[in-house]
Structures are given as C-alpha cells and as structure tokens.
C-alpha cells in the first residue's frame, strides 16, 4: 500500500501543479515536515496498482512467515533513516508492488519522471558523489534469476544489493540478519507476470501477431557488420531475455543487460530512462550498430518486443478489499511476533500496519472536504473505525515494549474482534470514498479548480 497518510499533501504543493488525467494523476507533494523538495511526485495517487504475483503461490504453495515479514518490511519506513524515514517513504514507494515507478519525480534528483539520483545528497549526504547521475527505478519482478544487481552489476548477491539500498542510498541503520533474510526472501518470490504471447522457454506463442513473428527473426538475425552478435546475444530468450553481464552500448558506461520480460510496463528505458518507447530504443541500436533495418523491419522488431514485454493482467484496481487483504498479510507477521515475544518485530509491525490503516482512512474524505458531499455519515463511521484500529494496535506495541506479552496478546485479540465491524464500516462508505472513480474525479477536479484560483 502507498503511505498517503504519512506523506501529507501540503496545500501549496498539491494545488500548485495538480494535473487531472483520467485515472492517472500527477500530484506534487511536500511532507508534513517539509522534508521532500517542493514538487516531488511519488506516483501514489493512481487508481490501479501494479499486479504482484508470487512464485510460491503460483506453484501451489503458500508464502512463508519470512516472505511475509519481508513483504511488510518492504512497506515500512522504519528500515530507512534520515529524510526517507521522516517522509514516510519505504521500498514500496519506489518499487510499487515490486514493480517500478514511472511517475516518480524528485526535483534536483530526477531528470525526468521515472528516474532519480540514488547518490545525491538528499537521502544520504555521506554517499553524495557530487554528480548528477539519475537512474530508473527497476522492476523487481523475476529478480531471483536476474543477477548481478544494480544498474552497473556491482552486486553479485541480492542480499548485498538490498543492504546497499537501505544503508547507503536511504541512510538506514545496519539491518539485522533477520531483516535482510526476510527482504531477500520476499523479493526472490516476486514473479514475472504471465504472458499468453510467450512460451516458458522464451519463444513466441500462437497468440503473438504475424508482425511479432517476423520481428523474432530480426531479433535473432546476426548484425550485418558483426556476425557474432545479434539482439539475442545479450537478451537471451531462454534466459529471461538477459545474459547476466554488463556491456558498454554507448549510453555512458557499462550497464547490465535488462530483461525484456514484462518490459512493456517498465518504461522509461535504458539505465537513465532516456527513451520512452521501443521505437526509440530500436532506432538507437539501428544507428549505433549500423543494422540497416528497413522501416518494416523496425516496425516488426518493435512488435516483437511488445509481445515479449506483454502481460495478461498488468494492473489491479485499488479497492477497500485489496487494501484489507494486504493488511491481513502483514497482521500475520504481528501474530507470530507476539507469540515469539519478539518486541522489535512487534514494534515494526504495529508501525507498518497502523500506517496502512491510516492510509486507508485517507481514502474517506473528512466532512470539511466539500468536494464530496454524499455519504457523510458513512465516511465518518469509516474514519472512526480506522482510528480505533490504530489505537488498539498501539496498545499491542506498548505492552510488548514493556515485556508484557500476555497483555499484548489480549490487545491483539481485541484488534481481531474489531476487524469485522471496521470492514463493514469501510465497505458501507466505499461508494463515497476515493476508491469510487466518480468521487475520485470529483475530489481531484475540485483541487484542480483551487489550483487555478491560487495562480
């Protein structure tokens, strides 16, 4: 879930550059503490979320406690430090549902939407290299089989890569072995999305177009000036369309080969996001390697890349139930931590789950929000229910912190009893919430009008 409750919308920022475009809205924000630059966009306002599937469940199994702990930590600001923690950011802020984030923009750190400088001074001054070198936020789908890690492939293991992100990029404290193991287990379980146009061994299926099949031949054809090379040399179809190597393709250094699987949803492209489309990418390689492609061959190659990069259900509509389902996963971690008398994990779980509830409550506009006039009683009841859930969670944390796990278990039992009535209250108010497309449009249209008045 995206932590809207912890990343507060400053009036000046949210009104000065509000854009309304169907379901996709660009909402510049500042935090309550003002720690993020004016005009920051975290892409947390979309009505649909990237679909997230797990290899364990696709194989018919069930996710382990460790994987669920990693999932929860992935959405927790507690593992970061400095500005990121103050702003309520988490791994999930940038890697939404394990995917990328093409809407991300941080002034002075981003050259375009979808990239930012991970070695700039904002999040960790100690690792500031004095260069402006933004990189895209990569999708983590299929990461288990996509070593090495980092855009330049400097990390051989996913564990080292994750530690670097937490400690060096976002100034977090040194994570414990338990935390690192859990994050690795979670990321390794994030699966590629199914693609009916492709077979399991990287070949086109019958569902692919004729143009894509012609493009497949172009993709595998040797370059005219170097018969030892083809597109498939680096983007190996049988190896998730990658080769585990770094190469200098004239883009400013040596960078790892990106997978093409599900890449339709990974734009912008190249390490710095300089290209928006496959057509631009193909044009670059055609010129760089003097491939001599005809207009038809270029179009066919684009069709092939589009087929390889496709997915059957790339996004999932955000609803009350999808949010509650995620909270339920995180709560299982809290359950186990109480049983194990693990006060540290209880504290993180309460903070994270409480944040998820508060974010959920933000979808139900307050009475003073005059852009939403209907369902005032229902919205009020939903917000009260959310507050009660958060308060009960605090009782769990306070009891665990003083070592009274019997009291923590009792408070947790109270929490579980409150879930059903809270769910009913949220469901009753859903037609009057920002989960409803018409209410959402009305709400943000009102903010856009205020932005015009503020000019």
Where are these regions (language model features)?
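Positively charged n-region of N-terminal signal peptides that target proteins for export
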Residues: 2-8
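Bacterial N-terminal signal peptides
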Residues: 10-22
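Periplasmic c-type cytochrome electron-transfer domains
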Residues: 5, 22-455
